Amino acid sequence: MRPAILLTNDDGVNSLGIWAAYEALSPIADVTVVAPATQQSAVGRSISIFEPIRANRIKINGNPAWAVGGKPTDAAIIGLYALKLAPALVVSGINIGENLSYESIMTSGTVGAALEAANQGTKGIAFSLQVEDQGDKFDDPGQSAQSFDAAKKVVRDVVERVLASGFPPAADVINVNIPSTIKGGYEVTHLARKLFHTGVEKRLDPRGRPYFWINGPLLEDAEEGTDVHAVRKGNVSITPITLDCTARTADEDTKKIFLK
């Protein structure tokens, strides 16, 4: 029997990235697409608790899918509980744009869906493809000019390896970032602290009232061994992630503050 995979994303069910992943995985698994109906980038692991969630059965290029009127986390939960799928893995992506560093995995809906699946008992793998032009992240994902050919090979190979060997026991999610041009092989990495400089741009609307854009250029350097450094070298970054955010090495110092 072929393994079952729940495939989701944050770019939306119409994204070329999710269908590239579908093409990569369909020959080796029974893949069910359950993804947000619309673009949901940068919503992280947020969840819809104040509005109903609708899931509609649709077809895209003849392939069945579920379009969920919510966030990536909602899609994962709907797939696991409402549709009663019992996948061997949840795969999220291929995201159009890299998801690197602490700041990105905390805001990424792609990684958020994989984390939610892991929290519900099914390990997840998140796949993201680097873009050379950061503006490409904000274009229509259904009309992306990105080439997914190399990324599809990575998706299939990574999933085949995990299905054959099992998930790393101490990890809950594997975050895979694929460079726009692959020059090397796989590199197991840890998260960099930041990917972008943080900036705020103030503008005035037509009535003269201020509004703000949060923006900032990419950082130019990154520590060796980090996901950012690996992708910039042209390596595929593979970062094991755990749900447990507890800073256990800080236990003793924290006790000195609060338990004296």
Swiss-Prot record:
Its EC number is 3.1.3.5. It catalyses: a ribonucleoside 5'-phosphate + H2O = a ribonucleoside + phosphate. Its cofactor is a divalent metal cation. GO terms for cellular component: cytoplasm. GO terms for molecular function: 5'-nucleotidase activity; metal ion binding; nucleotide binding. It comes from the Archaea. Coiled coil: none annotated. The lineage of its organism: Archaea, Methanobacteriati, Methanobacteriota, Stenosarchaea group, Methanomicrobia. Binds 1 divalent metal cation per subunit. Keywords: Cytoplasm, Hydrolase, Metal-binding, Nucleotide-binding. Belongs to the SurE nucleotidase family. It is an enzyme of class 3 (hydrolase). A divalent metal cation binds at D10, D11, S41, N95. InterPro entries: SurE (IPR030048), SurE-like_Pase/nucleotidase (IPR002828), SurE-like_sf (IPR036523). Its main location: cytoplasm. This is 5'-nucleotidase SurE. The gene is surE. Pfam families: SurE.
